[in-house]
């Protein structure tokens, strides 16, 4: 069940050729081992912590893996609400863009919230990069802030200060 370190793996390694790949945040593996185990089944499992590892390097590594080994699938799993974990999703989207492959792998994005695995779209990670679009979503759907209050300690703290 131990995940390999993606930054320490050769992009042309035989195990990557046409493989189903998992890139999971270290916290997913450490805090939710059952989720990591389930996602790892039938996949080459890698772990990464973008708080510790350079995400620009990670993006380049993913682009090189896509270009050189043509994986069939890439799944990213991170901790919901973690600002640095969000970078894993962004790195994959950016790597796909940089490669510009017409024959791209199947891509899935997941977040883990309170032990539950939730699939999110590639677009969710893209929109998260554009705060003015997030602002529009809040204005159209202000109840998002009520839901945020159920999960975010920072939001609860900021709400009390207003």
Language model features with spans:
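Iron-sulfur-associated redox domains of electron-transfer enzymes in respiratory
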Residues: 1-162
